C-alpha cells in the first residue's frame, strides 16, 4: 500500500502544474462592456473545463483511498494527513468557485469580436501607386530595370557631387543619373521613350567627357552606352510590345488621351478600376492571339511608319541646318560637268596628292603619320610568317647499325628503336645511296666561311682535298691563274674611264678630220667599248646623279631584305626597326631625288593627266596620249654611241 500511495502522491499536482489558466481582457467603450479578448481559444476552454471535472472525480477517488489507509496509520501521521485533506478541500473549493465564475462570464458576455491585424501603411501606398501608374510609366520602369542590370558596379545610380569628383559641376552643365530618371518617371515627366533615351545618352556622355579614356569609369560608360542603345532600339521595344501586356497598351492609351471627356472623372472609382482591369485583360488577350498573317501585317505597317518618321525627321534637320547657315547652304542641285570621283555619301572628298617637301623636325606643323599609329600594336599572335617545316611523318629513318668491336658476336647488330622502315628497306637505301657524295657541299662550306680568317680556310681546303683526292686544290690553282688576266682587263677599263681628253681649241674651229681622229682615239683607249656622248656638262652630271641614286636604291633594297629576312627573337612583339645604314641610304636617295627634281620642270616629272587624276578632276583631255610620260618604261631610241675599231694595221 505504501508504494501505491507514493505513486498517487507524485500525480497529485500533475495537471495543475502544466495547465495554465487563460488570461482574460474585457474592453469597455463608453461605460458599456463591448468585447472580451482571451489568450486561449474557445475550443481549448471547453476542453479545459471537462478535463478539470474529470480531475475532481479522480481526486475524490484518491481521497476515499486515503481514508481507508488512515485507519492503519499511527497517530502522528494521522494529524499530518488531516492537514493535507483540509488543504486539498480548500483548494478544491477555490477551483470550483473559479469555474463557476468563468461559466457566468461566458454566459453573460456578448459575441466575441475578432479584430483583424493592422495593415501596414507602406504596402497600401505602394499598391495605390501601382494602380495609378500609366502604361508608359510601367514601360519606362521595365526599361530602367533592364538598364540598371547593365551597371553592376552602380557607378551611375546616384548623382555625382563636387566632393566625389572635383570640378564636376564646372565641366558638366547638365548632370544625369538613374535616380533622377526614376524620379522623373515617378512624377510622369516623360512623355515618350525617346526622352528617356536622350537622358540615358546624356548620362553616359557626361561620364565619358569628365573621365579620361584610360579610367574604368570611361570604359564602363562606353560599355553601358553600347548595351543600353541595344535595349532602347526600336526592334527591342517592338518585341517588348508583343510580349508584355502594358507595353501593348501603350499605343492604345496614347490614342485614348485625345478622346477622353472630363465628365468621366465623376464615376465610381471601384467600378472604373474593375472595368479597366477587365478591358485590359481582354485587350491583352486580343493582342496575344492574332494570327500569323495579322502579326506580319502589323509589323510591316509599323516598319513603314518608322521609316516615314525617320525620313521626316531627317528632312526637318536638313531644313533647320539650311536656315541656320544664313544662306551659305542651299538645297538646289548643281548642274556642272566637273565632279569629284572620290566623293563620299556625306559630301566629303580627299585629295590624292603627296606633299612634295616633308617638314623638318622642329618646324610648325611637323607631325609624321605612320600606318602603325592607326592600327596600334599587335595584341596577340606572332610578328613573323609561319615558315615551312617538313612533316616528321615524311622523313624516312632507317635502322641504325651497331659496332661494338671484337668479341661481340652475340650482341645486337642494329637498332630499330627510332626507325620507321624495315631492315630490308634500310638495306636497299644504304646499298643505293650509301656511297654518293654531297655535290654542293664545297660551295656551302665556302659560303659558311666567307667571313672567316685564313686558318679555317686552310682547314676547309684540306678537308675538301681529302674528299676530292686533290681535285679541289687543282681547281683553285686554275682559278688563280685566270684571275690576273681579268684584273688587267678591268684596270685598263678603269683607266679609260678616268682619262679626260682635253680640247686645246674650241670644237667649232676643229675640222672634220681632227674630230674623227679624236673619236677614233677615244674608241682605241676604251678597247671597243661604246662611250656615251652627252650634249652638255649638265647632262653628264645629271646622268651621274641618276646612276648614283640607282646604286643607292639597290643597296637600300639589299639592306631591307637582309633585315626583314632575319628571324627575330620570340620575345619581341614588334618587328625590328630600320638600321642606321638604311636610314642613311634613304636620306641620301631623298636628297638626290630632291636635287634632280629641282633641275627640271614639273611637266618632265608628272603629266597634266596625272595631276588632275590625283586631284579627282575627271575632264577628258584630247592630248592625253601626248602628255602622258611613262617613267617606268625604257626609251625605244638607243643612246647615241660612237664606236670605232682599229684594224691590225692601225688604220
UniProtKB/Swiss-Prot annotation:
SUPFAM superfamilies: Bromodomain. GO terms for molecular function: histone binding; histone H3K14ac reader activity; lysine-acetylated histone binding; p53 binding; transcription cis-regulatory region binding; transcription coactivator activity; transcription corepressor activity. Residues 58-69 have a biased composition (Basic residues). A motif (Nuclear localization signal) lies at residues 65-96. Residues 47-57, 70-106, 273-301 have a biased composition (Basic and acidic residues). InterPro entries: Bromodomain, Bromodomain-like_sf, Bromodomain_contain_prot, DUF3512. It is found in: Nucleus; Chromosome. Residues 35-132, 253-301 are annotated as: Disordered. Keywords: Acetylation, Bromodomain, Cell cycle, Chromosome, Coiled coil, Isopeptide bond, Nucleus, Phosphoprotein, Transcription, Transcription regulation, Tumor suppressor, Ubl conjugation, Wnt signaling pathway. Residues 536-567 form a coiled coil. The modification Phosphoserine is found at residues 279, 289, 380, 482, 621. One of its GO terms (biological process) is positive regulation of myoblast differentiation. It holds the Pfam family DUF3512. Residues 131-235 form the Bromo domain. Residues 35-45 have a biased composition (Polar residues). The modification Phosphothreonine is found at residue 514. The modification N6-acetyllysine is found at residue 328. GO terms for cellular component: chromatin; cytoplasm; cytosol; kinetochore; nuclear matrix; nucleoplasm; nucleus; RSC-type complex. The keyword Metal-binding does not apply. There is a cross-link at residues 21, 52, 127, 186, 197, 201, 212, 241, 305, 307, 344, 389 (Glycyl lysine isopeptide (Lys-Gly) (interchain with G-Cter in SUMO2)). Its main location: nucleus. Interacts with TRIM24, PTPN13 and DVL1. Identified in a complex with SMARCA4/BRG1, SMARCC1/BAF155, SMARCE1/BAF57, DPF2/BAF45D and ARID2, subunits of the SWI/SNF-B (PBAF) chromatin remodeling complex. Interacts with IRF2 and HNRPUL1. Interacts (via N-terminus) with TP53. Interacts (via C-terminus) with EP300. Interacts with BRCA1. Interacts (via bromo domain) with histone H3 (via N-terminus) acetylated at 'Lys-14' (H3K14ac). Has low affinity for histone H3 acetylated at 'Lys-9' (H3K9ac). Acts both as coactivator and as corepressor. May play a role in chromatin remodeling. Activator of the Wnt signaling pathway in a DVL1-dependent manner by negatively regulating the GSK3B phosphotransferase activity. Induces dephosphorylation of GSK3B at 'Tyr-216'. Down-regulates TRIM24-mediated activation of transcriptional activation by AR. Transcriptional corepressor that down-regulates the expression of target genes. Binds to target promoters, leading to increased histone H3 acetylation at 'Lys-9' (H3K9ac). Binds to the ESR1 promoter. Recruits BRCA1 and POU2F1 to the ESR1 promoter. This is Bromodomain-containing protein 7. It comes from Homo sapiens. The lineage of its organism: Eukaryota, Metazoa, Chordata, Craniata, Vertebrata. The gene is BRD7.
